């Protein structure tokens, strides 16, 4: 493409001709030119550039058709280094235009159709169409997934999914295809089977986001695991486990509601699947060789976690409700849904120490505290692989997208000085932030979890009304963290059955949503009905499970799943030595030279 040098050359030629008449004299600047000199080179002014372009192209293609003066000027230019082997500019332009036309004829073309979407007209092979279909669902299947238990959220299905479906409309469902689905498969299956399978996988009650991850190895790992696993293939014992944990979550909420009506408890009614989710994370993280797990969370669901997971005694919680508890020892007088706890939980891989950090009212501010505690524990254990101590942060959907400390904590996740080998983030997504339900009023992104994309963390969305899917995605998240030592997000999408703190009436601000919620069965009822229908449990057994839980609560028995009954000294830290300690006491702070050298590496 002809640029500035071309016109600079024309101007230089004019100056040379002018200066040749004044050899031996000092060269004149353009500012000192006479009117006659300006007139003599006025044909080279900037206003004539378009004309000069065409004239020069004519000279290059047929020099005899232009006047002698112009021909002499262009001949003298062609003898300089800047203009040797010059080519016709218009031919360059035409060449590019032809390339664009050719590309437009071959590229993926879309035309408007009556339904307001698009249809591609480019003919593709069946193999190419199926490949496009698979890739579209892997990347955007989550936009069509059944993630909202209330079915209130309007789906914004990605255009690639719409096109992928239209692309295969003319292909016989009996066509046998083999396109690396499931990942690694060499077998051919009927097209109708492939479509049904991939829709259930990527647009069922699970929605996976991982196409934003730049590392192909990570993407392929997720695809391989997800497509070759069947989360619905669980045995009867696992189903009973899920049922009992849902009974625990729902049972505590109903008990507290009846015993302390109108009092704040910030329950997880509508997201009860959180309890089996956390139980599964503890079990799976322990299988991945974790010795300690540190939890951080705000008030939502905290009481349920304390009683049903960590093993806090029911009477201690009731005393906090009644505000007659002893302030001696570790009690601070803070509200019950801010207090921390720790215990040992027995898993199939041995005991694991679990801690829940104290938390103030300020949402998400506990996040960096948890990460700092985990890093300190890892350093104390010389845990260079960063798998002995694992952080799990439980967020609200509104606070995760709205609080700046979340982004700040995520930004430090892969740094050398502050990284902990990945955090498992769990979002209690009840689709309402205090009184705001419509995402258009609360954020500028499709999902509340989109902030995690900037560190390329995979995001696993799951419908909270499908506890079996919740269990599966918990295992997948824990295994991803173990494999890649990176953050991972579980978006547990449910609803909030009561008001913000059980003392308010949410129907005044969200009447449509809460009319739907009142008609919607709890996840416990839905799952119980499913198991009874499939003969996995009887109604009598279910009623007995409920009575047993209620009896344990009333008798002040621990209702946590697999709470360790044997004190493991290796997992307990003795804090008594720090109580009433002399803080100005001299302490040996020397470090061995080998340790310093090792740390420097």
Stretches with model-predicted labels:
Residues 435-445, 453-489, 493-499, 507:
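Conserved phosphate-handling catalytic cores of large alpha/beta enzymes
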Residues 347, 447-472, 519-541:
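Conserved thiamine diphosphate
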Residues 36-87:
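Subset of Sec-pathway N-terminal targeting signals
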Residues 54, 58, 62, 73-76, ...:
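Generic, well-ordered alpha-helical scaffold segments in large soluble proteins
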Residues 125-135, 139-176, 196, 488, ...:
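Flexible, glycine-rich loop/tail regions that form catalytic "lids" or insertion modules at the edges
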Residues 255-315:
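Active-site pocket-lining segments that scaffold enzyme catalytic pockets across diverse folds
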Residues 40, 77-273, 290:
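Extended, charge-enriched "interface" segments that sit outside catalytic cores
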Residues 291-456, 460:
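Cofactor-binding active-site loop characterized by glycine-rich and histidine/acidic residues
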């Amino acid at each position: 493409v002809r640029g500035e040098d071309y016109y600079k050359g024309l101007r230089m030629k004019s100056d040379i001709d002018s200066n040749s008449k004044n050899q031996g004299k000092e060269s004149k600047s353009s500012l000192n030119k006479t009117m006659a000199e300006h007139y003599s080179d006025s044909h080279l002014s900037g206003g004539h550039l378009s004309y000069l372009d065409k004239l020069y192209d004519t000279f290059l293609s047929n020099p005899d058709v232009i006047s002698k003066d112009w021909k002499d000027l262009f001949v003298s230019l062609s003898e300089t280094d800047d203009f040797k082997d010059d080519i016709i500019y218009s031919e360059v332009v035409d060449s590019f235009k032809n390339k664009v036309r050719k590309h437009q004829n071959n590229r993926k073309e879309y035309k408007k159709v009556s339904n307001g979407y698009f249809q591609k007209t480019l003919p593709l092979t069946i193999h190419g169409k199926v490949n496009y279909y698979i890739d579209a669902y892997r990347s955007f299947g989550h936009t069509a997934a059944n993630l909202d238990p209330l079915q209130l959220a309007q789906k914004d299905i990605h255009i690639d999914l719409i096109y992928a479906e239209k692309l295969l409309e003319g292909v016989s469902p009996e066509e046998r295809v083999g396109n690396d689905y499931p990942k690694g498969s060499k077998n051919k299956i009927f097209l109708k089977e492939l479509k049904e399978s991939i829709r259930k996988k990527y647009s069922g009650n699970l929605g996976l986001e991982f196409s934003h991850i730049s590392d192909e190895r990570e993407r392929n790992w997720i695809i391989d695991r997800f497509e070759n696993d069947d989360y619905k293939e669980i045995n009867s014992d696992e189903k009973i486990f899920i049922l009992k944990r849902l009974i625990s979550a729902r049972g505590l909420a109903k008990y507290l509601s009846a015993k302390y009506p109108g009092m704040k408890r910030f329950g997880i009614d509508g997201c009860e699947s959180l309890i089996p989710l956390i139980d599964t994370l503890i079990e799976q993280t322990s299988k991945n060789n974790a010795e300690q797990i540190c939890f951080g969370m705000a008030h939502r669901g905290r009481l349920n976690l304390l009683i049903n997971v960590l093993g806090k005694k029911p009477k201690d919680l009731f005393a906090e409700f009644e505000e007659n508890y002893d302030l001696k020892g570790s009690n601070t007088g803070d509200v019950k849904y801010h207090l921390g706890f720790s215990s040992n939980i027995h898993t199939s891989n041995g005991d694991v120490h679990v801690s829940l950090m104290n938390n103030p009212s300020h949402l998400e501010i506990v996040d960096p505290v948890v990460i700092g505690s985990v890093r300190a524990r890892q350093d104390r254990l010389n845990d260079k692989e960063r798998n002995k101590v694992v952080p799990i942060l439980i967020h609200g959907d509104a606070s995760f997208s709205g609080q700046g400390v979340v982004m700040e904590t995520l930004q430090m996740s892969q740094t050398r000085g502050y990284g902990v080998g990945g955090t498992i983030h769990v979002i209690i997504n009840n689709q309402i932030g205090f009184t705001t339900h419509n995402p258009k009023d609360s954020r500028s992104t499709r999902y509340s979890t989109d902030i995690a994309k900037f560190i390329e963390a995979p995001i696993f969305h799951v419908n909270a009304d499908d506890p079996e899917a919740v269990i599966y995605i918990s295992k997948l998240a824990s295994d991803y963290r173990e494999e890649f030592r990176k953050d991972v997000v579980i978006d547990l999408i449910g609803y909030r059955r009561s008001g913000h703190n059980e003392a308010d009436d949410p129907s005044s601000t969200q009447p449509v949503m809460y009319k739907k919620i009142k008609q919607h069965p709890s996840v416990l009822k839905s799952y119980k009905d499913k198991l009874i229908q499939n003969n996995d449990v009887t109604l009598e057994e279910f009623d007995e499970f409920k009575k047993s839980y209620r009896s344990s609560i009333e008798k002040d028995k621990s209702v946590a799943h697999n709470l360790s009954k044997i004190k493991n000294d290796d997992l307990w830290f003795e804090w008594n030595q720090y109580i009433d300690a002399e803080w100005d006491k001299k302490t040996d702070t020397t470090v061995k030279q080998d340790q310093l050298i090792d740390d420097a590496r």
